[in-house]
Amino acid sequence: MFTVFDLESNGLRGVADKCWCICYTDLNSDLEEIGSGSIPLPDTEKVKEFFRKETTFVGHNIIRFDIPLIRDLYGLTQEVEVVDTLGLSWYLYPNLLKHGLEEHGVRFGIPKPVIKDWDSLTVEEYVYRCEEDVKINTQLFKEQLAYLKIIYSGDTERIFNLINYLNFKLDCALEQENNPLKIDVESAEDSLEKLEQLKFEKEDALIASMPAHVTFRTVNKPAKMFTVKGDLTKAALAWESLLVAEGLGPETESVVVEKSREPGKPTSSTQIKNWLYALGWEPCTFEARKNKQGDIKNVPQIYAGDGVAPSIKKLFDIEPALENLDMLSLINHRIGVLKTFLSKADDKGCVQATVAGFTNTLRFRHNKPIANLPSPKKFYGKEIRGLLIAPDDEHVVCGSDMSALEDTTKQHYMYFYDPEYVEQMRVPGFDPHIDIALLSGLMTKEEAEEFKRIKKLLDNKEPVTDEELITFKSLDKKRANAKTVNFAGIYGASPAKLAETTGLTLPFAKKLHQTYWNRNQSVKLVAKHSIRKTTMFNGEEQMWLYNPVSKFWYSLRYEKDIFSTLNQGTGDNYLITNQLRLII
């Protein structure tokens, strides 16, 4: 038996102190409705009696809101079996932009009543809204189970294995929300001030190097050149003075003259691009955009990732001031992170790590401010991450990671088709990036050995000469390009994309791309022999990929994503499984 329920309260968790009502619909094992009701202004005994029912409770975001709120308000302690239709919505409908009951209600033709006042309306108004939410969610739950039966061929055990897995992930999200991190506000404000100052310095350096921004206007020959007495008019005198200044003859009818001259603006993409083109810029990074006519145009991009595009970095030797543009990109991003930290912090200076959904591999999509934070190795990354501190002396901030997780899961799949290469990768000291660099000709064997020798010295904190350090940095750039193809290749990156990312020529990027796939042909074989199917549900086709480790089906947008989806899904499942073992 299932009980689809919802509640209405006078606010969110941490604010609400009253539950207006609980509404529900009971379903039998065949999902037939066998009863419904509402509990206005429930007291503690009624709430506990409701949750003592022999049923599986179904709700939308109940793991992170409804049930925790019930525990807060009524002291509910018993554990209950649940199905959260929000988590299932994230899983089943990857193309939906929004997953709230309001959006699903539109699909089902059941409008969600709008209420903005959660304190002073009648109980009946809150009950009505709650009842309509239950109607929407009942339809959604029935649809979701029907869809899951198609995907999992009616295997109920596997369906509920998936549901329990999603439940655990949502419970992890709840734990994050229940344990907010504190922002070191004083240090954040200090860092923000320093970065703002650095931003001004970089902008000033760019302004000093950029061409001035000049605008022009057209001056036409005066219509009236002479007065009635035959003398030149004032306009005519000014015109003739202009012709003399410009070295033009009397036959001239119009002259283009300078209207204004201002310092260049680093914030103007048009001015920056004009400057770059004057320096010989050949763009390699583009963004497809539609114009008003619906035609798609590839627009050259100044930035790619954390900094400027590789094609602009090629111009650093010609115009060193462009390094300020690269740095300015990083500074602006870090300023944005700091401002978000400060704006999202509550009155205690704390922020929550919240989630916005699942990726197709069931990883979390994270909400700001704790999302896509720079690595400690990147510019201001250590300082930014250091701003997240424990809320008090009774807590400690800790984290966990698994070394080479995705590389290990990748080797698991590759082993079935190329055990020899996997055995090589498992040898201590093997560097897959150096391997690709050698095979592609990015590095010679002697350079590879020299890189390893100097790296060992640096790892052991032994002294190196200035010459060795210069050599290491040069070789490390070559290794970085090989590393790019190792990571990007597995996600289906084309030679053009590699050229754009690395700054290498397209012919060499093609060679690098071919080298990668010659070495990693087993990746294609894994993808080729993967288990896929396409479902038709509600008039929409959806590709699905089966993961033999997790035994889940993952939504798939493009066939080029088969291996990366398989690999990332396995890594996520392995990480969660080990977390469960630690907890148990």
Where does each model-flagged region fall?
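Conserved "right-hand" nucleotidyltransferase catalytic core of DNA-directed polymerases
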Residues: 2-4, 8, 112-115, 123-380, ...
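Short, glycine-/Ser/Thr-/acidic-enriched flexible segments
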Residues: 9-10, 27-29, 63-64, 271, ...
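Active-site-proximal helix-loop-helix substrate-binding element of RNase H-like nuclease domains
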Residues: 13, 17-20, 24-44, 55-150, ...
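Short active-site loop/helix that positions an aromatic residue
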Residues: 22, 63-75, 90, 271-280, ...
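Short His-Asn-centered micro-motif
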Residues: 59-61, 268, 400
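Short acidic alpha-helix initiation/capping motifs at coil-to-helix transition points
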Residues: 61, 167-168, 266, 427, ...
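Conserved catalytic core of nucleic-acid polymerases
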Residues: 174, 199, 228, 232, ...
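Function-dense linear segments that define catalytic or interfacial modules
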Residues: 354-467
